[in-house]
Swiss-Prot record:
It is found in: Cell membrane. The lineage of its organism: Eukaryota, Viridiplantae, Streptophyta, Embryophyta, Bryophyta. Residues 9-103 are annotated as: DIX-like oligomerization domain. 'Soseki' means cornerstone in Japanese. Residues 164-188, 281-304, 340-393, 499-524 are annotated as: Disordered. Residues 375-390, 499-510 have a biased composition (Polar residues). Keywords: Cell cycle, Cell division, Cell membrane, Developmental protein, Membrane. GO terms for biological process: cell division; plant organ morphogenesis; protein polymerization; regulation of cell division; specification of plant organ axis polarity. It holds the Pfam family SOK. Belongs to the SOSEKI family. It is a peripheral membrane protein. The keyword Cell division applies. This is Protein SOSEKI 2.
Length: 636
């Protein structure tokens, strides 16, 4: 620093201009003069020099601070106009830093917003008085009938500025008119709109608006004349816009060109199909009518508006839709009730679970069991058992729903017919009904009818003496069919047993056509020991009851001269039944009957030697029965 004899001193000042916290400009150096009576230059002296160099207002747009040492480091000390600027202690230099002042009025963002507002103000239309349009006076029209046409025109004129428009506003109006009316400029017919609205309200059941439409008939004619006069002046009226954008649905304009096929969303019909287990297995069918509908088949395409609200209102459309739906339904699907006849002498408990076989053979002839409302052909091919229950206090005829009646169709049962021509030897069984220990409990029974063809019987059973069967007879016996042995069964109560599935013989396999699985019914615990009665009888006098044996786990009883044998009350639940044939008694104990399987039609005896034959026998069981009914002639 050089001193002079003048009244001013000159110093060199280095300053840095910064427009941001992290952005610094290249340093500049200027010479500053200050009076000699001052100890150091001030910020006012620096600004005076910068005004002469950079122009007026430049120094005031920055905030200034000088660099000084502080505790072994450097800091920036802010100064004002009258503050002194101190040099660095090491070098004696004057270093200043200028930061741009953040003024809200001069902010770039605010300047951009202000500029954008000015551009928008130039585009907005003005009224005749030169002022901007008042948007608070523009209202959306919800109902055309409630607003006078003159008022609607006045609002549009005020919004569009009357006849004073610039070129940009005119182009926008023409584009909006093209979007609203499509390729045609036809005037909407208010009478057709009133008829469509009346049809729509008749479907929804609104009676209040129906009276309003009838009273506004004369008003619609005057409204049509006003629309024709002022249509050119109100091209963008919200009441005439398309209904797809949330506008009015009653004044939807017609469309001169419609697609030949339109997607129509109709109702969805839920129909419960016939719950036959052999066909449907209880599935539900939902049929939806979301299909393509040809607009030419419904009516004239010119008279059909494009509004989705008024489309279902055309005459004949709902009727045709219902007729098409009605023709698709089958008779079994329309049936909702079924009548089930209850047996007056048979009451069966409701099953808790059920099983059925996959294949069941059937013969030809009249049915012996009731299988629900099916034809004879369907019962022969896909016959399913029907388990039903009736109370002693209820009437003999019980009406149930189709779902409840067919719900038990999964229960397996054998329904076979009797061939009267090829049947000569017949064994039958009657109802065996036993009273329960509980007075309020229902009686449980099983009825089995067995038909044994003559060619299936052994020679000694027919002639009374033993004869060795021929080769042809063995072939006939080995190939049993449903016509030679036919049985009819009814549901019965399953007897609880602890036997496992491993004790079942080969003749009781589920794949066997004569071994269906019976329903499982739970019964209450009783104090008395269960009693099992096995009854068998034949019409042939050569076959006596001496050839019949009844056995249990712990005891075996044989009877002679009787056609029916009853086990004592303390007999075990697991009983064996065998039919002994002369000279073949040693094989009789090999074939067992397990009551826990509850098979009412099965191969009870299966002999494996060359002289042995297969004979099917039916067993009648009754639980808690103290006595048996009288046996009829030729049967039990």
């Amino acid at each position: 620093m050089d001193s002079s004899s003048e009244s001013y001193h000159k110093i060199e000042v280095i300053y840095l201009l910064s427009k941001g916290a992290e952005q610094d400009d290249h340093p500049h150096m200027i010479q500053v003069q200050y009076p000699s009576h001052q100890h150091a230059p001030t910020l006012r002296d620096v600004k005076f020099r910068l005004t002469a160099l950079r122009g007026r207002g430049m120094p005031d747009s920055y905030s200034w601070s000088y660099k000084r040492s502080y505790k072994g480091t450097f800091i920036w000390c802010d100064v004002f106009d009258g503050d002194d600027i101190l040099p660095l202690s090491e070098s004696g230099e004057y270093v200043l830093k200028a930061l741009e002042v953040m003024d809200s009025s001069e902010d770039a963002c605010d300047r951009g917003v202000e500029h954008l507002g000015q551009e928008v103000a130039r585009v907005l239309p003005t009224n005749r008085n030169g002022t901007s349009a008042n948007f608070n006076e523009v209202h959306s029209i919800d109902d055309v009938r409630r607003v006078a046409p003159n008022k609607c025109v006045e609002v549009k004129r005020q919004f569009m500025g009357g006849s004073v428009h610039n070129n940009m506003t005119g182009k926008a109006n023409r584009n909006e008119q093209g979007d609203a009316y499509g390729t045609t400029s036809r005037v909407p017919d208010p009478e057709n709109c009133i008829e469509n609205k009346r049809c729509l309200e008749s479907m929804t059941g609104s009676d209040s608006s129906r009276s309003n439409i009838s009273t506004d008939e004369s008003y619609g004619l005057s409204f049509e004349r006003d629309l024709k006069m002022d249509m050119k002046e109100m091209p963008a009226c919200p009441a005439t816009r398309s209904t797809d954008h949330g506008g009015m649905s009653s004044l939807a304009p017609r469309s001169s060109r419609l697609s030949r096929r339109e997607y129509v969303k109709c109702k969805t019909w839920a129909v419960k199909e016939d719950e036959n287990a052999a066909l449907n297995h209880g599935r539900l069918s939902r049929r939806s009518s979301d299909t393509l509908r040809d607009s030419n088949s419904v009516g004239n395409t010119v008279d059909i508006p494009s509004s989705p609200v008024t489309r279902p209102c055309f005459p004949g459309d709902p009727l045709i839709f219902m007729l098409k739906k009605a023709t698709k339904f089958h008779r079994s699907q329309l049936c909702r009730k079924a009548e089930v006849e209850g047996s007056p002498c048979a009451t069966v408990g409701k099953p808790s679970s059920s099983r059925h076989t996959s294949k069941i053979r059937h013969g030809s002839g009249p049915l012996k069991a009731y299988h629900g409302p099916h034809s004879s052909k369907s019962a022969t091919q896909n016959s399913r058992p029907v388990t039903y229950e009736t109370s002693a206090k209820e009437s003999e005829r019980d009406i149930r729903s189709l779902c409840q009646f067919l719900g038990a169709s999964n229960v397996g049962s054998v329904s076979q017919t009797i061939n009267k021509e090829g049947t000569k030897k017949t064994g039958s069984a009657r109802h065996i009904q036993a009273g329960s220990n509980d007075d309020f409990d229902f009686a449980r029974h099983k009825e089995v009818a067995v038909d044994i063809s003559e060619k299936l019987l052994l020679p000694e059973q027919v002639t009374g003496r033993y004869e060795k069967p021929s080769r042809m007879s063995k072939q006939l016996i080995n190939k049993l069919d449903s016509k030679s042995l036919n049985m009819v069964t009814r549901p019965a109560v399953r007897l609880s047993s602890k036997l496992g599935s491993g004790q079942a013989s080969e003749s009781f396999s589920p794949a066997s056509p004569h071994a269906p699985q019976r329903p499982i019914v739970s019964r209450p615990q009783e104090k008395a020991v269960n009693q099992l009665s096995l009854v068998a009888g034949f019409e042939d006098p050569q076959i006596t009851s001496s050839d019949t044996s009844n056995a249990g786990l712990s005891c075996t009883s044989k009877a002679s001269g009787l056609k029916a044998v009853k086990l004592p009350r303390n007999a075990s639940n697991n009983c064996y039944f065998s039919l002994t044939i002369p000279d073949l008694e040693k094989r009789a104990a090999d074939t067992k009957v397990y009551p826990w399987r509850e098979n009412s039609a099965f191969n009870s005896i299966e002999l494996y030697s060359g002289t042995l034959q297969k004979v099917d026998l039916a067993i009648n069981t009754s639980f808690n029965g103290a006595t048996l009914g009288e046996l009829a002639s030729g049967g039990c």
